[in-house]
Amino acid sequence: MTDNVRLVAFVRARLDEEEDVARAAGGEGWRCPAEVPGEIHDRSGAIAFSLRTHGYNHHIARQDPARTLQRIETSRVLLDEYAEVAALDTDRPERDFASGRAFGLGFVVRQMAAEHAGHPEYQVKWLPRFTQ
């Protein structure tokens, strides 16, 4: 298995884990009604949970399961695009469109992996490459 294949597998596994967590949380949107500060409500209007520390409720509501699932879906599109051309993503890419596409998508996928740098399976060699 090549390094790029391992990189794709690592990011896919993290997205799968995140999806499982979002689905376990109900998979739906949350909101913070202005009339009840500190409460986060689900789509039906029921209190999903409450948090009395000012400001956290809005941040948490923006990280709702539905939004997380949307982000995961778009991340998978990028990951699938990269997987098609990952073999062309090398330290010294050719100067053609396909290699440039692979290199650019590889940069994005490496950034996605770097979000999980604290994970025991993360490899430092997956850090994004910077070239001039």
Label each PLM-derived region with a short phrase.
Residues 1-57, 73-80, 112-132:
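Extreme N-terminal leader/activation tails
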Residues 5, 9, 62, 99:
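Charge-dense, low-complexity intrinsically disordered segments
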Residues 89, 94-123:
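Short loop/turn elements at secondary-structure junctions
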